[in-house]
From Swiss-Prot:
Residues 17-198 form the tr-type G domain. The gene is lepA. It is found in: Cell membrane. Its EC number is 3.6.5.n1. It is a peripheral membrane protein. This is Elongation factor 4. GO terms for cellular component: plasma membrane.
Amino acid sequence: MSPLAVNPPAPASTDPSVIRNFCIIAHIDHGKSTLADRMLQATGVVTPRQMKAQYLDRMDIERERGITIKSQAVRMPWNVDGTDYALNMIDTPGHVDFTYEVSRSLAACEATILLVDAAQGIEAQTLANLYLAIENDLTIIPVLNKIDLPAAQPEKYAAELANLIGVEPEEVLKVSGKTGEGVEELLERIVRDVPPPQGVKDAPSRAMIFDSVYDTYRGVVTYVRVVDGTLVPRERIQMMSTGATHELLEIGVISPEPIPSKGLSVGEVGYLITGVKDVRQSRVGDTVTNQQKPAQESLGGYEDPKPMVFSGLFPVEGSDYPVLRDALEKLQLNDAALVYEPETSAALGFGFRCGFLGLLHLEITRDRLEREFNLDLISTAPSVSYNVTLEDHSEVEVTNPSEFPEGRILEIREPMVSATILVPSEFIGAVMELSQSKRGEMKGMDYLSEDRVELRYRLPLAEIVFDFFDQLKSKTRGYASLDWKADGEQAADLVKVDILLQGEQVDAFSAITHKDKAYSYGVLMTGKLQKLIPRQQYEVPIQAAIGSRIIARENIRAIRKDVLSKCYGGDISRKRKLLEKQKEGKKRMKMVGRVEVPQEAFVAALSSDEDNGKDKKK
């Protein structure tokens, strides 16, 4: 067994040859955070008394859902053959929505641990992240986790993993994040196999930002990996993408609580505090350099996060609008990918149109708004961004059905995605049928082993954001896994379906759908609303329309008061007079009456698909 480090290398004066930077990539629920916990314990940076499960997942929502949303970086000392090493572990998010954060975390490392659950095998996101690691030329250490599970098949999956990355099955390490078995061997393997960082100590300083979090007391805490040169406290630094300059108030390492140091040198991973209050000023992927002696070239790879899915968020109580605005401002401090703008809806009042990276991002943001700020929210059906070309060749970007231009449209282009689906071979037929029903185009198919298949499809993003994942899981008994990335645009035959209540359009229920699906959407919504809207004194038609053409209709039957109850026998003309009078009254009421859609009907109509999905996931 390797003893704990005797003299842990001090930050700023650590020789790059004893630094090892690595990250852990895995599919959701394959045990990344649990393995990280065991490493923290084995290296002694967290005492048994301080230890708690998922130590690095700081947000309640991360711990509750068992997912990692924000990257974390921890410095751990470890001794091998009498030499003290500094291991920097970067814990990465595993979900498809946060692929950009994962790619930046990978760029900050020299190696990655490819972690696979010994009971489930390789999943789609494991593959996607593995390809990212290969693109970044990282050393890959294959590891099977959860070997203590009764259902574990370490031999079978070790062969599958070895086959995938081209090593011998004996080279695949077997560990248990729960019991700690094999963790010390893994730490020694990291020291032995991971190359030390390369960089020029005397060159102008360059450091890459791979994450930033907002701290209420200290402002933005930026996580960086130094590539060249040295960063020291009190120097003025410059962000290379924006040119903004700041004073470095504090610099240090996280082990696993922040420890200020005299600086950070080549290959080291740590944090900076500049007193900035907005995460958007220290963007993930940007390069930090010295203002006096700036580097000529940035480290590259920086992209602005681009929202893919749009949804309207409205407070159930209209008076909560200012609270929602403040809450979104605070969340944006911690989440540079969240964009929002004010929106008004005739039906739902004042709210915000928000842009998200994907459905999980939307769900987490909504959860955090409701939980941390005590808000009750209605979210409209998720939509994507369409590019519409009109006949005069002007272009309009549409993120909301209400912005859809009426009139002469030349072409509508919708965003497309490349999807990778991993499924057991017996479900191939069901998955192909589902993908084709969602307008998917098959790009290829590979057998990873006798019973696991990788299917590649090109699909419209709009078909994926609604309930594709839920349907995929239910058709494959939960065994399929999905990963996707943006893949350009494509012209499509799309129409806007409006829902009319007594001839008046209700903007919250409008949707942009493919022409072939417009009828089924119309029938679905009219049927749903017929059950949800209370009956009135007069008959109310609910119609679905494309432009001026009605494609579906349901009626809410009128409540009829028995006006003849007080007539005991008597003349028929008396009864007829009362009935005519009632008929006139209903006619007049129908002309002046307005149908109020109750709040519950909005919530049920807009979120029932989503809730069904949630039930399926449980």
